[in-house]
């Protein structure tokens, strides 16, 4: 058989015609130097600030410093495998993370990659990590309560949906415990809500620079109580590079905004922002940005303000969703006038101030009710709570003032003695064990008992036992009363007050 040149050339032409049409054009640069989680890259002329870039081996980084002859890139991963001369590719996309209901019940890193060994996450969408906060027009005043289940907080420092309430205190004063109790407290509310998404609250917990053992312990507690079903944990632990610790809060907020923007409610806990500021300081100094006060860069206020401004209550036209934030700040030796604490205090809508001294006295949660405030105030309380909680703060403030005086004088008049007795019992009543959040109705009944003199004859050491007995009594013999307070929110007076008094009188007779 003869070789036909024309046929061969036709076949070759056909094959050449379709060859290499999907040629990929990539803008690349070269690594000039690398170390401490920072790479200097030459040649990425058109890169954007905040753009994701890719190193060999799939390691990602973010362009932060755009200089005349090179780009400063922070690396999200191990920089030991990157060497001088490596090629760096632009991805042409700003740092984004997965979002959606599929993330609930999972533990992810700062980029949204699962780290709990439960397989990949089927996220429905991706969201840019660092977006602008909602403007003034889409917002609405905070008016729905966000119950923590803690008597001292819900009665005296109420938090509303869409509020930013700072938890501030020294190390080991129970800051994380308050945040964790708040997550656990949502379980009963979420179960009672059924399919009504407008009542449910989803929780996002961000661990920044913490020990892995601490995060594992927290996840275990959430799994044991079943709270993990409505919670997402984002972990950038102490062993993660500084850029990951810096990014994690923004990434987690983007995941939480998915709920806010779909007319649902979310709570985000940043534990803690002091460590994020330290990570950002490290990055900034390595990028040779000029240092300011306490060696933090000049834009460290903006670092936190742009993050916390994303928590908001949206109005009806924008879905009526909300994002509530509980940022945590660790102080050194009770110094709230340091740089980062004063910054975050000025950004947030109030603070829960925890004191080491109270903690060691056994007053836990160790909330200093005099220094703690909620700038949203009683608009974030139910009517029933508002009517019973009013006198508590005043009585405790008067008690603290008198207690300081009473140390000097021995002959006190009857009114002062009565004030001191009542104050001691109210202080005892505000104590609460960890992992034992109470419902709104239970807190109303307990505080009503405290302010209306039911405890005045009970010895101070028995107040805790008295309260536990009362709660047991209410849960077994007065279920209708608790349901009534929960479902028909109104001031505690008239018929409702009589019902509560009747339940308390019945219990007081039996208590011994």
Swiss-Prot record:
MF terms (GO), sorted A to Z: ADP binding; ATP binding; proton-transporting ATP synthase activity, rotational mechanism
Residues bound to ATP: 169-176
Domain of life of the source: Bacteria
Subunit structure: F-type ATPases have 2 components, CF(1) - the catalytic core - and CF(0) - the membrane proton channel. CF(1) has five subunits: alpha(3), beta(3), gamma(1), delta(1), epsilon(1). CF(0) has four main subunits: a(1), b(1), b'(1) and c(9-12).
Catalytic activity reported: ATP + H2O + 4 H(+)(in) = ADP + phosphate + 5 H(+)(out)
GO cellular component assignments: plasma membrane; proton-transporting ATP synthase complex
Annotated membrane topology: Peripheral membrane protein
Alphabetized HAMAP family for the sequence: ATP_synth_alpha_bact
Similarity-based family: Belongs to the ATPase alpha/beta chains family.
Name assigned to this protein: ATP synthase subunit alpha
Lineage: Bacteria, Pseudomonadati, Pseudomonadota, Alphaproteobacteria, Rhodobacterales
Organism: Cereibacter sphaeroides (strain ATCC 17023 / DSM 158 / JCM 6121 / CCUG 31486 / LMG 2827 / NBRC 12203 / NCIMB 8253 / ATH 2.4.1.) (Rhodobacter sphaeroides)
Keyword check for ATP-binding: yes
Site (Required for activity): 372
Enzyme class label: translocase
Record localization: Cell inner membrane
UniProt-listed CDD domains: ATP-synt_F1_alpha_C, ATP-synt_F1_alpha_N, F1-ATPase_alpha_CD
Function: Produces ATP from ADP in the presence of a proton gradient across the membrane. The alpha chain is a regulatory subunit.
Main location: membrane
UniProt keyword terms in alphabetical order: ATP synthesis, ATP-binding, Cell inner membrane, Cell membrane, CF(1), Hydrogen ion transport, Ion transport, Membrane, Nucleotide-binding, Translocase, Transport
InterPro entries, per the entry: ATP_synth_asu-like_sf, ATP_synth_asu_C, ATP_synth_asu_C_sf, ATP_synth_F1_a_nt-bd_dom, ATP_synth_F1_asu, ATPase_a/bsu_AS, ATPase_F1/V1/A1_a/bsu_N, ATPase_F1/V1/A1_a/bsu_N_sf
EC number(s) per entry: 7.1.2.2
């Amino acid at each position: 058989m003869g070789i036909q040149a024309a046929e061969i050339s036709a076949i070759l032409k056909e094959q050449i015609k379709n060859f290499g049409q999907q040629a990929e054009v990539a803008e690349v640069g070269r690594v000039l130097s690398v170390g401490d989680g920072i790479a200097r890259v030459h040649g990425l002329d058109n890169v954007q600030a905040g753009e994701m870039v890719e190193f060999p081996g799939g390691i990602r980084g973010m362009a932060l410093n755009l200089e005349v002859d090179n780009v400063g890139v922070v690396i999200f991963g191990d920089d030991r495998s990157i060497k001088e001369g490596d090629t760096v590719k632009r991805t042409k996309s700003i740092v984004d993370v997965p979002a959606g209901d599929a993330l609930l019940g999972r533990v992810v890193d700062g980029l949204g990659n699962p780290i709990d060994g439960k397989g990949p996450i089927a996220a429905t969408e991706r969201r840019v990590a660092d977006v602008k906060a909602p403007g003034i027009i889409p917002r609405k005043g905070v008016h729905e309560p966000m119950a923590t289940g803690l008597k001292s907080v819900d009665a005296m420092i109420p938090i509303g949906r869409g509020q930013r309430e700072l938890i501030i205190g020294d190390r080991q004063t129970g800051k994380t415990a308050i945040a964790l109790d708040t997550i656990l407290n949502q379980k009963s509310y979420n179960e009672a809500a059924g399919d009504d998404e407008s009542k449910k609250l989803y929780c996002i917990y961000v661990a920044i620079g913490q020990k892995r053992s601490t995060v594992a312990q927290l996840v275990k507690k959430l799994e044991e109580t079943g709270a993990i079903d409505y919670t997402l944990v984002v972990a950038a632990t102490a062993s993660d590079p500084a850029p990951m610790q810096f990014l994690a809060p923004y990434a987690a907020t983007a995941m939480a905004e998915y709920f806010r923007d779909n007319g649902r409610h979310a709570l985000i806990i940043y534990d803690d922002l002091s460590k994020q500021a330290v990570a950002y300081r490290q990055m900034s100094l390595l990028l040779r940005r000029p240092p300011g006060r306490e060696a933090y860069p000049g834009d460290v206020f903006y670092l936190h303000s742009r993050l916390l401004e994303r928590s908001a209550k949206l109005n009806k036209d924008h879905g009526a969703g909300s994002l509530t934030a509980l940022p945590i700040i660790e102080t050194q030796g009770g110094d709230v006038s340091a740089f980062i604490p004063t910054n975050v205090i000025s950004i947030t809508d109030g603070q829960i101030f925890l004191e080491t001294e109270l903690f060691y006295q056994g007053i836990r949660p160790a909330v200093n009710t005099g220094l703690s405030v909620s700038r949203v105030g009683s608009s974030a309380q139910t009517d029933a709570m508002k009517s019973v909680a009013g006198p508590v703060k005043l009585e405790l403030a008067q008690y603290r003032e008198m207690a300081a005086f009473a140390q000097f004088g021995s002959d006190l008049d009857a009114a002062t003695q009565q004030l001191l007795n009542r104050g001691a019992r109210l202080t005892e009543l505000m104590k609460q064990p960890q992992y034992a959040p109470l419902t709104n109705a239970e807190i109303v009944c307990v505080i009503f008992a405290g302010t209306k003199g039911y405890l005045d004859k009970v010895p101070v050491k028995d107040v805790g036992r008295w309260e536990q007995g009362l709660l047991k009594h209410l849960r077994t013999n007065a279920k209708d009363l608790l349901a009534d307070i929960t479902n028909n929110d109104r001031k505690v007076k008239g018929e409702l007050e009589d019902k509560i008094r009747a339940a308390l009188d019945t219990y007081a007779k039996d208590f011994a």
